């Protein structure tokens, strides 16, 4: 079984560079090459969504020279893959806050590749840049409240307070940064075992694999191994299924990653 939505925390660039007796920026350069190879593999094996953690809202605390280099690296990568991804039917979108801290040239490059690939219908590559999961949810809730101010605010608020919780959850979901389905598989490289404020809304039932490889070491073979591990797991989504043949509850579940995709095409 191939996951529909794979998310990746690409951790370990700086540590890998230090192991090579190089500057941290060298690790980031190698990390971009690895990402491009993983994108190619996602296309080859039919994965529908790939979401990657490129720059968090907490990364602003890094040295200014490193942050500036990351901006330059992003712009260069966009220019390099822009035509290729359009030709390969890859839709690219950025998730995060586009604040004035980000150089205008970088914002322009992001907008450009989004526009160029907007009509693509293959792999959807979501790049989380200046992203924080708590901020994403808070901004979505703000947008729901803002919607209430259109017309009779008091009545609109009452309506939302009285609606079924599933419907209210759907309203929040539609105001998130991008129209993404739940994550099926999360991969984090770099030895750490935490989520780092990445996609908390989407990770509720994700299978998680923590890799001891640093991101520049993460090969296509390592990615395939993660897919094999995912395929070997039983996803129960918190429940069990009653077998009509035996009358016994089993650990299998009728839901699969394709069900999560239905409202997000």
UniProtKB/Swiss-Prot annotation:
Keyword Magnesium part of the UniProt annotation: yes
Name assigned to this protein: Di-trans,poly-cis-undecaprenyl-diphosphate synthase
Catalytic function, reaction form: 8 isopentenyl diphosphate + (2E,6E)-farnesyl diphosphate = di-trans,octa-cis-undecaprenyl diphosphate + 8 diphosphate
The species this protein was found in: Giardia intestinalis (strain ATCC 50803 / WB clone C6) (Giardia lamblia)
Family indicated by similarity: Belongs to the UPP synthase family.
Pathway: Protein modification; protein glycosylation; Lipid metabolism
UniProt enzyme class: transferase
Keywords per UniProt: Lipid metabolism, Magnesium, Transferase
GO biological process: dolichyl diphosphate biosynthetic process
């Amino acid at each position: 079984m191939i996951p529909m939505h794979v998310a990746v925390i690409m951790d370990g660039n700086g540590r890998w560079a230090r192991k090579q007796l190089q500057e941290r920026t060298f690790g980031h350069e190698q990390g971009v090459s690895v990402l491009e190879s993983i994108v190619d593999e996602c296309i080859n094996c039919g994965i529908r969504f790939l979401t990657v953690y490129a720059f968090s809202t907490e990364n602003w605390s890094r040295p200014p020279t490193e942050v500036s280099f990351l901006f330059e690296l992003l712009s260069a990568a966009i220019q390099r893959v822009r035509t290729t991804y359009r030709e390969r039917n890859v839709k690219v979108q950025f998730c995060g806050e586009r604040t004035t801290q980000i150089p205008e040239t970088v914002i322009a490059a992001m907008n450009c590749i989004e526009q160029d690939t907007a009509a693509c219908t293959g792999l959807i590559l979501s790049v989380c840049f200046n992203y924080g999961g708590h901020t994403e949810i808070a901004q979505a809730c703000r947008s729901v409240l803002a919607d209430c101010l259109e017309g009779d605010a008091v009545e609109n608020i009452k309506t939302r307070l009285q609606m079924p919780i599933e419907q209210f959850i759907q309203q929040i979901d539609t105001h998130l940064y991008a129209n993404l389905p739940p994550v099926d598989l999360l991969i984090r490289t770099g030895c750490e075992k935490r989520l780092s404020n990445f996609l908390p809304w989407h990770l509720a039932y994700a299978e998680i694999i923590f890799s001891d490889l640093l991101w520049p070491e993460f090969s296509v073979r390592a990615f395939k191994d993660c897919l094999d591990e995912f395929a070997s797991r039983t996803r129960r989504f918190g429940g069990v299924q009653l077998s009509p043949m035996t009358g016994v509850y089993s650990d299998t579940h009728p839901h699969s990653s394709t069900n999560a995709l239905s409202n997000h095409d």
